[in-house]
Amino acid sequence: YNEILPALKVRGSVEGKKVAIIGGGPAGLAAATFLSRAGVAVTVFERKEQLGGVVRNVIPEFRISADSIDKDVELCKAYGAEFKLGAEVTSVKALKAEGYTDVIVSIGAWKPGRSPLAYGEVTDALEFLMEAKKNGATMNIGKDVVVLGGGNTAMDVARAAKRIPGVEHVRLIYRRTKRYM
């Protein structure tokens, strides 16, 4: 990686194009990498202070390390993409007025699911993972945790919950058999 990164070269030159990318998550970084590699002037606007989106802020460290995410960001920077962190964009029209010829909106499609459970404490999986990643050692979620689902996110929630001090039992409830998990 360290030998290859300095050798990366822009593969072309695209005149008259200046692209703004709203969102520095996986889609925004991918778009920035491919466009800047092709010689397009690219600026990524990220409202948070770090790039990576859900991958950095939600997916647990035991699945992908911060170092791996940082390397992806460095790859994007190696091709010349510019990044503006802590920059929330509220108007595509304003970006166009600043001279951007094209705008890519890659803000993610996060819409928390809501459980139909009438009683008890229910937390959205992505909200839980984000909180566990930031404050897992100090969270108080009780000693018994039930996770609804059997996919990758449910497994991440179960594994993250098991690592929280005070949690004794984590149970998965899934509507199908183990074969379909």
Question: Can you annotate each of these PLM segments?
Answer:
Residues E15-F45, K84-A94, V103, W110-G113, ...:
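Rossmann-like dinucleotide/flavin-binding elements
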